């Protein structure tokens, strides 16, 4: 059975497990500050074509989404996302818990259009009482979407252009990014995503025992 929920529900590649075994007894500084993390950061920057990019390591998609959105937005701002988007439907109020509202946009097969962002922003600022409303502060998309659909390079560039026009940071959820990048129908590369977005993340495969595993 093929399982496409996200990129981190599979076990680790045997070569990764072997390397973990080989380095297990090394004494290193805290996670994120050791030589292996430094090496990983450089490899990620090279793959993205962004030599000056900041790279951080977090655990789990929901935590990452909440951390990024909570860090980018001002207290009076919300995040624009598809009405079918992951942060809109499937994160159990994690974004709202940070004090920010998810401002939903109409979606077509899970995707939002640049025109929808323009319409929302223009309508918002055209309302004389907008000072009493939640301001649009950033845009969230995922690739693939909740429906498994992919943004084309043209669509991504159009969304990026609108976001720059209105000074809205563009955030791409990468929980399923690996599937999107290797799809035979995709024309978007990792470098395209790095160029068009302000922040995105890449999920890495890992193995983590569940409580049930520990009890057996």
Language model region names:
Residues 52-73, 103-110:
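Conserved core of the PLP fold type I
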Residues 186-204:
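Conserved active-site segment immediately N-terminal to the catalytic lysine
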